[in-house]
Amino acid sequence: MESVEKNKHLIRHLKIQRSAYEKQSSTTAQDNVVLSIMANSTLTTLTLSSNEVGDNGAQVLSEALKTNSILTTLILKRNKIGSYGAQALSEALNINSTLTTLNLSSNSFGSYGAQALSEALKINSTLTTLNLRYNAIGDNGAQALSEALKTNSTLTTLMLSGNSIGDNGARALSKALKTSSTLVTLILNNNSIGDNGAQALAEALKINSTLTTLKLVRNSIENNGAQMLAEALKINSTLTTLNLEKTLIGDNGAQALAEALKINSTLTILNLDGNSIENKGARALAEALKTNSTLTTLHLHVNWIGENGAQAMAEALKINSALITLDLSNNRIECNGGQALCEALKTNSTLTFFNLEGNSIGDNGAQALSEALKINSTLTTLRLYNNSIGENGAQALSEVLKINLTVTILN
């Protein structure tokens, strides 16, 4: 820590690992370290993750933040900060006017801590990014934050994954989204949100005109929730990224989203990984891709689209001129599906990233791919791991790479 003290007027970014902070012999010594750092006149980013800062350390940081006018980013994840520590930091946010990013993920302050931070957000006018992942804030914490969002006019990114907010919390946040004009990114992964919560969010998306990114990974929104979100996408004109990975939407949900893609003209990234989508859902999405001209990234990793679904996707790729990234890994595509996709690559001129891992396309699929790569001049990344490709297939790919100069990454 001596070097930090000596150079404290030169350092702009500082990351203190657990060993450096915890080696201090007492709480007082640790507090002195923090105070010394915060007295720095150039430091803009401070990372103290996994240092067992606790409530006492958070209180020391809070006092320093009240007078510090330089620091813009503070990262305190995994620090055993409880509700008292969150309360202390909230008091600092009432006064501090320079901090723009605060990461408090994986602490333990619960709903009381979230409520304290929410009160601060009603006053604070500089914070733009707040990460509260995995803090057990529950629906009460989400409700408090939603009230703050109705007043706050600077926060643009809110991360609340792993907080068990449930449908009630999702409904509360949805109400805030109807009036918020600044929030652009909302991450609600792994929150026990069901179709009712998804429906509430969908209603908000019909009105909201600022949100560009919504992530609902590992929530049980299922078919009904997907249908509601799909209806919202037909109206919404600002959302560009929607992540519904592992949300149990199935074929029916995929079909509903496909219908939305025929109308929507703003969504660019759609993630449907791990949703038990079979060839029926894949065919629907493929039909949408024939007319959609804005989607650039589609993730369908770990679904069951099979040969028929792959063939439908291949037909879409012959027509579509917008898609840049396509992930069809682990989809039971096999040889025939692989060959169909390779035929499409001969005419497609936009796809640059293609993931076919874990599809058992075999030597015949690899040979078909090598023929496609003699013609295709846009693909730069191709992933083929775990495809039962033997010596003949590997040889064919090896030979074509002597000719093809655009593929730079081949797994």
Give the location of each predicted region.
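Leucine-rich tandem repeat or coiled-coil scaffolds
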Residues: 1-411
